């Protein structure tokens, strides 16, 4: 029984360490966004870590967006989170490396999705 408990504790510790590293990375990405740094080199995992971190610091906003829009990609949810952070269209375009048409298209798809 003691061996099972030790094994489970080791698994819990490994999961906690992994989650801690991901949240730390999410914090770094969040700070980058606050400084209007570009996401152009972000991987899908980076988007996921940013969203996970944002969910920890502002769960109601993430929950609201997920409820209002059923088919959110990590990139689209990140766009909504940037809007929630009060970023201007120009800032969002710079951060997400979007053209004016790309920004319009994203807004159109989101408005169409929420109908």
Predicted feature residues:
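Cytosolic nucleotide-binding catalytic cores of signal-transduction proteins
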Residues: 35, 40-115
